[in-house]
Amino acid sequence: MDIILWLQAVILGLVQGMTEFLPISSTAHLILFSDLLGWKSIWHKTALDAMQFGSVIAVLGYFWQDIHQIVQGSWQAWQRRDWQREEWKLLLGITVGTIPALAAGLLLKLAKVELDRPQIIATMAIAMAILLGLAEQWGSRKRTYQDIGILDGFLVGCGQMIALLPGASRSGSTLAAALALGLERPTAARFSFLLGIPTLTIATLVQAKDVFDEGTLLIPLVIATLSSMVFSYLAIAWLLQFLQRHSTWVFIWYRIGLGSALWGAIALGSLQS
């Protein structure tokens, strides 16, 4: 039984890590993957929370130099009253952009709204594909880090708010918003990741109690977290490299195919609410 749990932990961590930071929705894949394999026990729900730790550690580790530079540069800007400094504008953009998702997430939690339904996942998979396609088609892709300001942070943060709907994808919604605002692809992806750090970290801390309550399954939870951390790091590195030379159309078509397949499965009764 232990070996089976450990294997499940590795697989779930792989799915979480490879989909959390790609614009294809980790929540959708984890929910559907668990549903198809019959992994819907309390342990698996706890594992989903634990794996967020792995993703947070990965993104913090990958962007540690960026974070250090933003904090240091912002402190220097504060001392010199240099409000046009790049790091200061980035910090303000990230701070303001974090507010919409946190506010919406708090409201959903207080209202105890359940959104993890196959119909919502399938709909959002296709809807976000359309939005990402429009952003890819019409975005100018000329703006860089130097051009990012508070308004950009707020608007991309509103995109992050959409990711509260399963199937939308935090990476997909923020990437679409950033591209629509004219940011070049690598800059859009990098800003998307940096903007997600506060939200992911806070959400993970909120879920921490559920993880630590599951003390009897500590080893599988640690394995799932480590697996998620490794594959999250690899996914971040791969996506940033990929977007240096390619568009997001491969993800757009993937989402359309995924959403269509899900609706087919729902129609056939393979996926239940």
Swiss-Prot record:
Signal peptide: none annotated. The keyword Membrane applies. It is found in: Cell inner membrane. Its EC number is 3.6.1.27. Pfam families: BacA. Disulfide bonds: none annotated. It is a multi-pass membrane protein. GO terms for molecular function: undecaprenyl-diphosphatase activity. Its main location: membrane. One of its GO terms (biological process) is regulation of cell shape. It catalyses: di-trans,octa-cis-undecaprenyl diphosphate + H2O = di-trans,octa-cis-undecaprenyl phosphate + phosphate + H(+). It comes from the Bacteria. The chain crosses the membrane at residues 3-23, 47-67, 90-110, 120-140, 148-168, 186-206, 217-237, 249-269. InterPro entries: UppP. GO terms for cellular component: plasma membrane. Keywords: Antibiotic resistance, Cell inner membrane, Cell membrane, Cell shape, Cell wall biogenesis/degradation, Hydrolase, Membrane, Peptidoglycan synthesis, Transmembrane, Transmembrane helix. Bacitracin is thought to be involved in the inhibition of peptidoglycan synthesis by sequestering undecaprenyl diphosphate, thereby reducing the pool of lipid carrier available. Belongs to the UppP family. Catalyzes the dephosphorylation of undecaprenyl diphosphate (UPP). Confers resistance to bacitracin. PANTHER family: UNDECAPRENYL-DIPHOSPHATASE. This is Undecaprenyl-diphosphatase. It comes from Thermosynechococcus vestitus (strain NIES-2133 / IAM M-273 / BP-1). The lineage of its organism: Bacteria, Bacillati, Cyanobacteriota, Cyanophyceae, Acaryochloridales.
